[in-house]
């Protein structure tokens, strides 16, 4: 619906303006709005960019987001049987721009699919990604933790 899309774009622009003014990164969850999302992010030209959270798009969108400074965060969806395009993204995202999440309480990773998702399942996602990328769990955990702290500097004090 055009009115709804226009309202969402206006609201998103306000959020992006707030991020620019405060110097904070943005956390973006986008569905079925790929072109609009990328256009608005490019237009905003944020100095601190942010993260495309619970990413479910293809490598083309991931590459476009990476090119403007964004991180890509993968959830339990990457473990789903029908998520081959997302696994390709997981293989290609530079390790210094990768984040891992659960998106609780939904989208529990295999082997917990069909149950409520819990924050502790982030380890399952990270273990899956480590195998997929051919690195140890420890390496992946260390790198994604460093990425998180770089993107959200205040997390260093916690």
Mark where each language-model region is.
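Active-site metal-binding loops of divalent metal-dependent hydrolases
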Residues: 30, 54, 70, 77-78, ...
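Short secondary-structure capping/turn micro-motifs that flank functional sites
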Residues: 35-36, 81-82, 146
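Amphipathic alpha-helical segments at domain termini/boundaries
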Residues: 107-109
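Divalent metal-binding pocket/active-site signature
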Residues: 1-68, 88-89, 93, 111-120, ...
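Active-site glycine- and acidic-residue-rich loops that bind
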Residues: 72-88
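Non-cysteine beta-strand/loop elements that form the S-adenosyl-L-methionine
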Residues: 96-104
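Mid-to-C-terminal alpha-helical segments outside catalytic/metal-binding sites
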Residues: 121-158
């Amino acid at each position: 619906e055009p009115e709804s899309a226009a309202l969402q774009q206006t609201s998103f622009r306000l959020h992006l303006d707030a991020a620019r003014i405060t110097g904070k990164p943005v956390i973006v969850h986008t569905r079925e709005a790929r072109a609009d999302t990328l256009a608005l992010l490019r237009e905003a030209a944020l100095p601190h960019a942010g993260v495309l959270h619970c990413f479910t798009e293809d490598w083309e969108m991931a590459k476009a987001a990476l090119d403007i400074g964004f991180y890509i965060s993968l959830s339990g969806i990457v473990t789903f049987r029908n998520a081959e395009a997302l696994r390709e993204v997981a293989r290609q995202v530079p390790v210094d721009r990768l984040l891992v999440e659960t998106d609780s309480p939904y989208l529990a990773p295999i082997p917990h699919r069909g149950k409520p998702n819990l924050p502790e399942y982030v380890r399952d996602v990270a273990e899956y990604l480590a195998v997929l990328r051919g690195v140890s769990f420890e390496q992946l955990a260390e790198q994604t933790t460093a990425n998180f702290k770089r993107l959200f500097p205040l997390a260093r004090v916690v």
